[in-house]
């Protein structure tokens, strides 16, 4: 299977630059036996008593830092993950090498020192700062918005789901951005169970597929946690099992043993693309419209069927749906 099989043309004006208000006023394309055009708030009507909705409660950390080198040159750093006694970072700037010191925050009080160059703008660094790194990031860090979003986000909470809890993602699980607390309340009132899983979105979100053959791509590890309670709720589902987002699908598939969800804490490199055999019993998934040639588009193609999905994307473009992180949503039934 070739990477070009997952390419499509999207007019730039359809790339959403900001979220809609309220959250659930975004458009919803329902892909079932036919295509329906709705608002996200209408999703309540597709749930029935006995269904279970699974949500990823990961919270985005303000992991993007903007600062200067000792020479005064501008630099940006994205904190990716813990790495031994240091942290793995993506750093944008010229002449970054081992021993380089970078300065962030008021009067450059937070100092980052490069201790290893791993190539492709990836570095292992150590921090010299007063207080915990988590607290420092909350004070001086920014939401790590995707590069295709050029507009400044005034309200950082709009890049968080209303139910986000567990800190650790460097990108939002965007399918969940459409939910409001009121919408979740209405869904529960229908007799729908809600289960939470955690998958921290990692560097793989920013890593393009460079292999010509899709099968040759290797995913970066992502942290997953599913509690015994959540596994029980999911396994006791008598109606439809609905997963909100590609991250939730990946978490469920990564923790499924003999058709049952098991409690899990660890890392997953699971790569889902067409011809993958789903085992967790997901009946429907909620997702946004994804970038061409991305692993997220491949996952959704595996779930919906590539030709079926690309026909839906073509109709979405014709109907001026908004794409990507702050864009509109799909509800896809298998």
PLM segments and residue spans:
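Surface-exposed, charge/polar-rich loops and edge strands
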Residues: 1-334
């Amino acid at each position: 299977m070739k990477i070009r099989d997952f390419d499509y043309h999207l007019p730039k004006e359809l790339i959403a630059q900001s979220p809609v208000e309220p959250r659930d006023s975004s458009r919803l394309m329902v892909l079932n036996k036919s295509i329906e055009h709705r608002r996200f708030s209408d999703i309540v009507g597709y749930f029935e008593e006995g269904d279970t909705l699974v949500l990823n409660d990961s919270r985005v950390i303000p992991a993007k830092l903007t600062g200067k080198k000792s020479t005064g040159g501008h630099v940006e750093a994205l904190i990716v993950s813990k790495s031994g006694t240091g942290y793995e970072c993506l750093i944008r700037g010229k002449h970054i090498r081992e021993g380089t010191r970078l300065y962030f925050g008021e009067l450059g009080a937070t100092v980052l020192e490069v201790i290893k160059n791993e190539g492709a703008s990836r570095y292992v660094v150590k921090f010299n700062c007063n207080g915990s790194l988590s607290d420092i990031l909350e004070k001086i860090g920014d939401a790590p918005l995707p590069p295709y979003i050029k507009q400044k986000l005034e309200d950082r909470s709009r890049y968080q789901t209303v139910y986000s809890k567990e800190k650790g993602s460097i990108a939002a699980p965007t399918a969940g951005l459409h939910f409001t607390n009121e919408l979740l309340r209405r869904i529960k009132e229908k007799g729908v169970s809600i289960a939470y899983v955690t998958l921290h979105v990692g560097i793989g979100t920013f890593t393009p597929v460079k292999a010509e053959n899709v099968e040759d791509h290797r995913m970066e590890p992502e942290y997953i946690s599913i509690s015994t309670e959540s596994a029980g709720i999911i396994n006791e589902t008598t109606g439809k099992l609905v997963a909100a987002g590609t991250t939730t699908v990946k978490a469920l598939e990564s923790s499924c043993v003999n058709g049952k969800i098991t409690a899990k804490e660890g890392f997953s490199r699971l790569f889902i693309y067409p011809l993958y055999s789903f085992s967790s019993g997901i009946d429907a998934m909620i997702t946004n419209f994804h970038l061409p040639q991305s692993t997220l588009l491949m996952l959704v193609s595996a779930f919906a069927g590539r030709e079926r999905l690309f026909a839906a994307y073509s109709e979405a473009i014709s109907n001026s749906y908004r794409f990507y992180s702050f864009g509109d949503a799909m509800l896809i039934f298998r």
